From Swiss-Prot:
NCBIfam families: accA, AccA_sub, PRK05724.1. Acetyl-CoA carboxylase is a heterohexamer composed of biotin carboxyl carrier protein (AccB), biotin carboxylase (AccC) and two subunits each of ACCase subunit alpha (AccA) and ACCase subunit beta (AccD). Its EC number is 2.1.3.15. It holds the Pfam family ACCA. Belongs to the AccA family. It catalyses: N(6)-carboxybiotinyl-L-lysyl-[protein] + acetyl-CoA = N(6)-biotinyl-L-lysyl-[protein] + malonyl-CoA. GO terms for molecular function: acetyl-CoA carboxylase activity; ATP binding; carboxyl- or carbamoyltransferase activity. It comes from Shigella boydii serotype 4 (strain Sb227). Residues 35-296 form the CoA carboxyltransferase C-terminal domain. It comes from the Bacteria. GO terms for cellular component: acetyl-CoA carboxylase complex. This is Acetyl-coenzyme A carboxylase carboxyl transferase subunit alpha.
């Protein structure tokens, strides 16, 4: 898979293009007198060092771009790489099956769990089918149905958050978008089973929160979590989306800042260059964190889970 490089990664892209050119020449003519392998090795080492240097000093806006990277692993990628025997469940039993939310039962190291997550889609047709990862009310009602099923069968719930936000269309509003989100917030706070939430890409406003109330909340290193997109914030405050980088810094959308504010519990490190550079390694790290979180929560009674979750929610904000 050829990588898509973001604007701030262009120096890396130029090196990788040179490596690809030399590799192609080497394949075409293996009888060349010059030692291309040594040059390729040197350029690869230089590319790694340059990547380390660039990624050691990323700003909030650059991280926001990484969170939206088109090759970043989505929910179903992690389901494939970190879980076994996934059986997808569909529909809200009231209106429709929203493809922007996927969910079902799977096994995590042999243990049955309920998985729920946003799914954006990659190719144009799939993006449209998934509504670019923006759920309608029926998506959140499907998620709630699966959560209630998990509670009945005493299965832990694992959610993956990756959405620009809930769908703002007229039809979604007419079908009760705000009510569906609010109901999920209320019901998730009352669930009697462990709930572990992880932001794997974009965590956009209420659309993210509707599956984001949990006992443990994690973020991948280059994910973002905010009440509005940087572009939206900039358009409101400065009347120009061009101020998005400034807004991103001011909003505190990145994992270290949110951990400092005690809004999340853990930051899961990503492979050098981001999760899309090595999805298998990212899935292994994510799986290890999920297993550790469930081990911590397994020792708690139902009442302890509910009380801890309540105290967590009440700790947010400033008096």
């Amino acid at each position: 898979m050829s990588l898509n490089f973001l604007d701030f990664e262009q120096p890396i892209a130029e090196l990788e293009a040179k490596i690809d050119s030399l590799t192609a020449v080497s394949r075409q003519d293996e009888k060349l007198d010059i030692n291309i392998d040594e040059e390729v090795h040197r350029l690869r080492e230089k590319s790694v060092e340059l990547t380390r240097k660039i990624f050691a000093d990323l700003g909030a806006w650059q991280i926001a771009q990484l969170a939206r990277h088109p090759q970043r692993p989505y929910t179903l990628d992690y389901v494939r790489l970190a879980f076994d025997e996934f059986d997808e469940l569909a529909g809200d039993r009231a209106y429709a099956d929203d493809k922007a939310i996927v969910g079902g039962i799977a096994r995590l190291d042999g243990r049955p769990v309920m998985i729920i997550g946003h799914q954006k889609g990659r190719e144009t047709k799939e993006k449209i089918r998934r509504n670019f990862g923006m759920p309608a009310p029926e998506g959140y009602r499907k998620a709630l149905r699966l959560m209630q099923m998990a509670e009945r069968f005493k299965m832990p719930i694992i959610t993956f958050i990756d959405t620009p936000g809930a769908y703002p269309g007229v039809g979604a509003e007419e079908r009760g978008q705000s009510e569906a989100i609010a109901r999920n917030l209320r019901e998730m706070s009352r669930l009697g089973v462990p709930v572990v939430c992880t932001v794997i890409g974009e965590g956009g406003s209420g659309g993210a929160l509707a599956i984001g109330v949990g006992d443990k909340v994690n973020m991948l290193q280059y994910s973002s979590y905010s009440v509005i997109s940087p572009e939206g914030c900039a358009s409101i405050l400065w009347k120009s989306a061009d101020k998005a980088p400034l807004a991103a810094e001011a909003m505190g959308i990145i994992a270290p800042r949110l951990k400092e504010l005690k809004l999340i519990d853990s930051i899961i490190p990503e492979p050098l260059g981001g999760a899309h550079r090595n999805p298998e390694a990212m899935a292994a790290s994510l799986k290890a964190q999920l297993l550790a979180d469930l081990a911590d929560l397994d020792v708690l009674s139902t009442e302890d889970l509910k009380n801890r979750r309540y105290q967590r929610l009440m700790s947010y904000g400033y008096a």
